[in-house]
């Protein structure tokens, strides 16, 4: 299987970071791109084996684009700290990367929740984002 880095952008995510990292522990590298958190985010991430890099936050895309070239692996999986990679998604990603692919990027369908309940209407039920891609090809 081709190697993959999971990148998790953070700022004061101590409530979420442990579960986010646990959901991508299967990745070859977990890279936390932190915006100088003032809580225990960095401490928790390092204690769980993540590599932490830091810079001041500009905006979401700039933070992610700054982190992407620092990934050690040719494939990148972006995960926000309040998101989780399900075992089903993990299996699908591993399947794609173990077979080889001509594609440079993949859409990931998301299941969104609001106040603890799944959103099944209003357009959010079909939400998808590009979160799995080749490091040197996409931004």
Descriptions of predicted regions:
Residues 3-5:
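Cell-envelope/extracellular polymer assembly enzymes that use nucleotide-activated donors
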């Amino acid at each position: 299987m081709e190697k993959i880095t999971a990148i998790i952008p953070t700022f004061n995510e101590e409530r979420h970071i442990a579960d986010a990292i646990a959901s991508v522990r299967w990745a070859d590298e977990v890279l936390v791109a932190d915006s100088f958190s003032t809580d225990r985010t960095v401490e928790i991430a390092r204690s769980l084996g993540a590599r932490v890099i830091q810079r001041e936050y500009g905006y979401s895309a700039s933070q992610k684009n700054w982190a992407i070239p620092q990934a050690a692996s040719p494939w990148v999986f972006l995960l926000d700290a309040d998101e989780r990679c399900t075992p089903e998604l993990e299996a699908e990603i591993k399947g794609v990367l173990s077979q080889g692919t001509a594609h440079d990027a993949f859409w990931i369908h998301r299941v969104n929740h609001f106040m603890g309940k799944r959103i099944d209407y209003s357009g959010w039920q079909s939400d998808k984002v590009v979160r799995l891609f080749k490091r040197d090809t996409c931004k």
